Regions:
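Bacterial N-terminal signal peptides that target proteins for export
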Residues: 1-7
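C-terminal motif of bacterial Sec signal peptides marking the signal peptidase cleavage site
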Residues: 13-16
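Short helix/turn-capping signatures at newly exposed starts of structured segments
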Residues: 18-154, 161-164, 181-206
């Protein structure tokens, strides 16, 4: 009997200790908490509710640029809290959101107190189908008939839209192209690279 107890003792110790942690085993990292929804009163007395952008991909679609929507008031008071980590400055008809690695140029919507056109360059914007800066035109699943040559600051660039989505525009640079006419589809497939987005506020027209 005594001998059986001696043999059983080490087994009891092992059971009590349980399985040992493997050295160097990585422990799961907790995800950062999601930004809290912010509620403020707009200048016209309406309730302005949004989730601030604090990092990661800036999601774009027909209805919004991150926390900016067509109903967003065009004012520093409305835009600054939407981008708490960015430098936000401007006046009159344009507000600049400088995120360090990317810029949002926000125009006022003429005749209203709301945001209008928004130009997105740099940073980590992402379109509704995963479109990202530096993407090739050939990989963006765009239709050639929905593209046109840019003007003014977009001269020699090519601007495209997706079917039924006139608000979000894709701006492509075409290295070596200096003409004021639309390059052929073959040239776009070979050279065109996504350099930015334009989100048209108000009633978009080409």
């Amino acid at each position: 009997m005594f001998r059986r107890l001696i043999l059983a003792a080490p087994l009891l110790v092992l059971v009590a200790c349980g399985p040992a942690d493997k050295p160097g085993a990585a422990k799961p990292v907790a995800s950062p908490p999601a930004p809290a929804v912010v509620t403020r009163q707009a200048a016209d007395g309406t309730v302005d509710r949004f989730t601030p952008y604090v990092g990661g991909p800036l999601m774009l679609d027909e209805f919004s640029v991150g926390p900016l929507m067509a109903q967003t008031e065009f004012s520093l008071e409305a835009i600054k809290p939407r981008f708490p980590k960015a430098k936000v400055d401007g006046a009159f008809s344009r507000i600049i959101v400088d995120q360090g690695d990317g810029i949002l140029e926000i125009q006022s919507n003429p005749g209203t107190t709301r945001v209008g056109d928004i130009r997105i360059t740099g940073g980590t914007p992402k379109g509704p189908r995963g479109e990202a800066l530096r993407m090739r035109w050939a990989d963006a699943d765009l239709d050639y008939p929905r593209c046109w040559i840019g003007k003014d600051r977009d001269a020699h660039a090519v601007i495209c839209t997706q079917p039924g989505e006139p608000v979000l525009r894709y701006v492509f640079s075409v290295p070596g192209w200096t003409q004021d006419t639309l390059p052929s589809e073959a040239i776009l497939r070979e050279r065109a690279i996504l350099r930015g987005f334009i989100w048209r506020g108000g009633a978009p027209t080409q």
